Amino acid sequence: MFRFRRIAAHPKTDDLRVFLSSGTTSSERSVHAYGDLALYDAAARASARHMLFPDVEKMRLVILAPHEDEAPSSSLEYMLARFADWFGTQCTWVWRDGALDLELLTEVLRQAEASKEAVAVLGTSFAFVHVEDGLGDRRFELAPGSRVMQTGGYKGRSREVDPEVLLDAIAARLGVGTPRIINEFGATELSSQMYETTLRDDIGGALGPRRLWVPPWVRATPVDPDTLQPVHGETVGILRIDDTANLDSVCCIQTADLARRLDDGIVVLGRAPGAPPRGCSLAADQALGAQ
């Protein structure tokens, strides 16, 4: 819907910020116009505080994504810039002019390693894939308290990666335990984000299965692809998200992602058969693959 119509409760002249989807799989790009970002900011800050930074007020951030000045229409880059404001003691953006600066990344991580300063490394899944491709035998032992947030899917421009293989590779590369490597689920069409629970579980000493925590103002429901009615138990369906932070547009979003319920959360299993890959991770792979 967002690809075909501008959907907003305010006139176009009152747009404060307009986010566009990556436009990687279709000539039409989803358009999400905001007349006010206060609710978006409140939702993003509350979720990240609860799931990504529950044990620290601020820490050093290393970001494997463009700065919002380089990608002003990206909701992900906007969110990461706000994370730098809210949660960063200092922040290094290692994506410069459409490419990852692997030498800068190495320098920053070596500095953190030497000073025993915990860091949060944030980026798309395929940015981490390209880090794996480019760093060779360089390995790090980041300080206790360090963490990783990856976002986006695992199907890129020319290949698909196994999420478990990537998880283990990131852990081995950075010296961070796999429970402290979590996935964030978001979209241009949404104002809220969902995060995997293992970091918070690990901090609390009660590690459970990987699943996405759903904020209390969001409802995530797997539905039958034929009837669009909710499925029961752990039956796989396509994910519907009701996001009340989308106050100025449409709250109910029907995705093409496969999902099932698990305990108190949701497990996303990838795109439904026949659905085109999309999103920030695919865009990162396309940009970096062109280097």
What kind of feature is each model-predicted range?
Residues 20-25, 196:
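Hydrophobic alpha-helical segments that mediate membrane insertion or helix-helix packing
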Residues 1-20, 28-33, 40-42, 46, ...:
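Active-site diphosphate/adenylate-binding microenvironment
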Residues 34, 65:
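Alpha-helical substrate-recognition element adjacent to the catalytic core
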Residues 1-3, 77-78, 82:
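Short, hydrophobic/amphipathic alpha-helical patches that form generic packing surfaces
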Residues 57-60, 67-69, 73, 81-291:
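Active-site glycine/GP-rich loop and adjacent strand/helix microenvironment
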Residues 36-44, 72, 101:
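Phosphate/oxyanion-binding active-site loops and adjacent basic polyanion-contact surfaces
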